[in-house]
Amino acid sequence: MKMNLHCFANLIPIMILALFSNSGLINATEVGKRTDALEASAWNESKWISAVDAPVVKGHNNGRAADGASWFVSTVKNEQKIVSAKWMTAGLGVYELYVNGKPVGGEFLKPGFTHYAKTKRSFTYDITDIIRTKPNAENMLSVQVTPGWWGDKIITPGGYDGMIGKKCAFRGVLELTFSDGSKRRYGTDLKNWKAGIAGPVKHAGIFDGEEYDAREPMGYECVDKLSTPEENTEFSGDILPSDGAEVYLRTDLALAPVKAYVWKNVEGAKENEFGKVIIAREFASGTEMTVSPGETLVVDFGQNCASVPSFVFKAAEGTVLTCLPAELLNDGNGAKIRGMDGPEGSCHRENLRIPHTGIR
C-alpha cells in the first residue's frame, strides 16, 4: 500500500506557533475578536460541566493522559434581533471554541499553564460578526476540551494516584444584547448543554502528542451522540481574565524544509554502530511525496524548534500515518558510544521524555 503526502511540517518557535506545508503556508481561519471579560459575578450564572462518559486515569502508572476528547454543545435561539454577542470562556484542559462550526480565536493550547488548584485563565470573545442576528435564528456553541494542563503528566508528579485533574471541563457565559437595549446571559448548565466523548481527536496531551482520526465527524456534527453533562466540582480556585495566550499563529515565521527523503535499508552497520540509512528518494519542496510500506520519510527543517506538524495525505482507508518529531538526526554512522539510537540520517528520539509517542 502506498501513501501519497503533500507533506508539511508546522513550526512553533518557542511561544510562537507557525503552520506551514511544502506547498505553502497553511492558512488557519478563525473568527471572533478578543475583548474584555464580563464582570467576575457573571460566572455565578454558569457551572463547570463535564462529560459523564469521560474516562478517568487511575492507579500509579499515570504516564499517559485519558483517551478521547470531551465535547460540549448548546444551541441558543434569539429572542429578538441581536446587536452584540460576547462569550466568556474557561476550561479545565486545553480547549477550542466553535460558533456555528467555525473556530473562534487565534490562540493555541488555551488556557496555558497555571497553578492547577489556584488559578484558571478566561478568554472572552466578541462574536457579534459571526452569529446569526435575526429574531428566532439559532446559533450553535461548541467546545472541544482535551486533558492538557489539567489531566495529564505535565502537572502530575510521578507516583501520584491517577492524574491531578480527573475530568476535562468547560465553563462559559454568553451575553447577548438585543436591539431594544436589553441583555440576557446564557451560562453553561446541565439543562441546555450536551456533552460526551466524540470527534476525530482520539488522544491528546502536552507530552503525549495527538492521535487524530480524520474519518470521524467533529463533535458539533454528531450532537445525537452527546448526552446531559454532569457538574464538575474539581476546581475551586479563581478564574481570572487572560491578557493573551502563550502561543499564537505566526505565519510570517513559517519555515520551509531544507531536505526531505525516504529511506528503507541501512549500510555500514557494525557491532557498536547502527550504520547509515540508504536514501531511496529525495523530494523537492512543493512536490508530492510517496511513501510505501516499510519506508520512512524524513522531513528536515535544518534546525531544532517547537513545532506542530500539518499533513495532507491520501491513502487507503485504515492506513495509519505516524509522525514522530525529533530535535536532531542521528549522525556519526549511528555510533552507540555517542548516544545514537539509530542509523545516521534517521530521527533521534531517545532524548525525549516520551520517545515512542507522537501524532497518529
Predicted segments with their positions:
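N-terminal secretory signal peptides that target proteins for export/translocation
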Residues: 1-8
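Bacterial N-terminal signal peptides
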Residues: 10-22
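Bacterial Sec-dependent signal peptides at the C-terminal "C-region" and cleavage site
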Residues: 19-33
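Extracellular/oxidizing-compartment recognition motifs
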Residues: 29-360
